[in-house]
Amino acid sequence: MTSIQERGTSAHLHSLKEGEASDRSSEMLPKQRSIIGSHVQRPPSQTTLGRSRAGSNTMNKVSGLDIARRPSENLLSNMNCSDNGNGGNMLNSFVNSALPPPKVNPAQTRRERPASNSSIGTKTTEVFSSTSASSSLGDTSDEGEGSDADKSKINTFPSILMEKATQGRGANGNGMRSASNNTIVEATTDGSKMALQKSMSFDDTAAEKTMNKSRHSYQEQFSSKKSQSSLLNSKQRSRAKSQTCSSTGYNNSSILKTFGISSKISNSSDRIEASSLEFNVPSQKPLNCKPLTPSQKYRLRKEQSEMNLRNTIKRKEKFYDSQEQILELQEGDVDDSLIWNVPMASLSTNSFLASAKPDDMNNLAGKNDLSEYTGGLVNDNSEISYTKQNHRYSNISFASTTSNASLLDFNEMPTSPIPGLNKVTDFQFIQDTTKSLASVYLHSSNRLSRSKLSERTKSSDFLPIELKEAQNQGMEDLILVSENKLDVVSHSRPSWLPPKDRQEKKLHERQINKSMSVASLDQLGKNKDREEKLIRDETNRQKYVLLLDRDITRNSSLQSLSKMVWDTPFSDETRSTIYSEILQSKTRFITKNYIQPFHELQELLTKMGDFPKNKEIEISQLIETSLRRKVSGLHDICPDLMLLLKIKSISSQGIVTGDELLFHHFLVSESFQNLGLNEIWNIVNLVQMTCFNDLCKEKFDAKVLERKGVVAGYLSQNEEFKDEFNTECINSTTWWNILERIDHKLFMWIMDIIVVNNSQSYKNSPINEDEFVNKDWEYYRSKKVVINYKILISFALNVLLNYHFGFTDLRSLCNVNDQRFCIPVFINDEFVDADTVNAVFIKKWAHYYKKF
């Protein structure tokens, strides 16, 4: 019965094939062969028939469209080679009539790759669906590229077989009615119908079971052991490929079973599961050696990262759950099994050990990274990324372990006995080893802590002043200042303000360095000027001596003297002599003729007995207001000042403005201390009569407020002086308020300048004593005294323009309560040179004096 059925079916299909060959177009047969067996190696008897039915032009057209062959083609080729001629004719006729080829757009010359969203779009989270598995399965054939339409054709293979089988059944029925009543052929046709229907139903059931099993195996594999698929060797991979080819054609195997050739194909469920397992396992490199698309790689990495995260969370939860009973232990209720003989470091050294980063360990880690990179270049992309990731973590752990080990000196450990050979118990061996390890750790940590503390002690010298003050107050220990804190603190910002960021710190450091460079250059210039000034002062002092020897009253000497006095004050040895000679010549004519002798007035004061109380109070109040409350009160006041003022009060001139200042500074000056009160009396009266006489005061008051004068030219330009540009604020009396605020050293220099600018050349025009016999002082003053009010006005102008702060006007200057207020500003700083400040004041004064 079986042989009759086979022969009948073969004959029926052969006749069906001949009948449809004339009705169908020439393109149908190549399309059908492209799905199942367009390139099947047929026996010689079938080759001629296939060529005559299909035509070479149609086959060339299909081959030029780059339509990939299916895995069933190779399978059917093997079966056709082993089958007889009748079986081959029957199979070829069924293939040519049952399966239509895919429709191809004739205008499309190149198969374009589909868009990423359409090629991998899915609603599930699976990396590869059954469709993608089947498509990758089809790509393992001889062709390299296949279209998505061909892959969908393979997946819908059972429905195509059902349709073509129904069409074939109808065609067979028509052929049998036109051929006469042949009972054998009808029986054969009915048998083929039943067999084909059974095969279709079996194929549908088998396909559904296979898909369910593949999904189930995929889920079980990812939930239990993810690394199962990566451990397949090359033999298992090749075996999985062969099983995949057979399992992909499971629909074909059920059809061929109908024709009695099912023994050629193995359609077991175990092999189907193996193939589905192989292709559902996500891996960076597919088995067909084709690279994945970027979207598939992304989904693969996403799935792997999610699985790693889930596994990590499970391990963490499991670890902490197992430790819950340890956390619940109360203090003092500790299990004995939890106590170990482990050496522990103190908190101070533990921080050092944790933060230590040796340079050799960094170099070692860098070399490992380089070797790892160069060694991994021979692998593919997936292996490089996986290897570099693993090596990175291994290098970090190795470097940290080696860095910690390098801090420990294991050479201190004694040689340990060998267990089993020496008579040492295990307990004794473990105890000795732990003691040795503890000693090594403690010694190494102590050595490291000492080195760290020594480094911090050295670096504490460069910390900001605020931190040093905090240490002095017990608020912070500079030895415990770490390197991280040193990075955020800076000398240019107080410690209570937020730290600077790196860019701001660099910018400020650059600006500070620039400012320091400029300041250093300025300081170098100042040092050079100071050295030059010292040399110049010493030279000028020697010149003063030479001028005195040569006659200082000469015209040339006075010119040189007037220039040098602006740079260098008189020395203590030459001051008194220069004053006397340039004001009254060597003959001392004024002292002899117009100044009352000191000893006569002193005798008169003695004869008076009790000095008038009101006069004495006035003198005391004058000393108090003019000296003690001013900058002169910072120094001791000579007791002889009271005597000199009393004598001056009973003299013919009486006490005039400025007497208390002149007597005080001359008494304090070393230039007149050794000369006695008589000489001081004569010098003070000489200066008052020549430099500050009544005529000079009158001219000062008249010229200082002159509208076209120099003072008015400066002060009228500024509206701030409009309230003090009057006779009440600027006059000869308020001029002395300025001198009350002048320091002693600068005061003597000012007197030197005023005296020199009131001198005259007695060498060229000597004093004729006979001319001034029985002449009063006014006559002599009109003939031989220089009235230089300009030097006094320029002095006041210098103060008003450059040092007018701390007081409203010259009249209110005497009422300033600050004793330390000084002109120039009193600076009590050891780094500030008072001589330099005074020299600047004198230079400005000389500048304004040249304007007159």
UniProtKB/Swiss-Prot annotation:
Protein localization: Cytoplasm; Golgi apparatus
Residue ranges, compositional bias (Low complexity): 124-139, 224-235
GO cellular component, one term: Golgi apparatus
Region (Disordered): 1-158, 206-248
Annotated GO biological process: fungal-type cell wall organization; protein transport
Residues recorded as bearing Phosphoserine in the entry: 72, 201, 459, 517, 520
Entry keyword DNA damage: no
Main subcellular location of this protein, as a coarse class: cytoplasm
Start-end of Polar residues biased regions: 43-61, 74-96
Basic and acidic residues composition-biased segments: 15-26
InterPro entries: Sbe2/Sbe22_C (IPR031403), SBE2/SBE22_M (IPR053949), SBE2/SBE22_N (IPR053948)
Family: Belongs to the SBE2 family.
Function: With SBE2, is involved in cell wall integrity and polarity processes like bud growth, through the transport of CHS3 and UTR2 to sites of growth.
Full protein name: Protein SBE22
Organism whose genome encodes this protein: Saccharomyces cerevisiae (strain YJM789) (Baker's yeast)
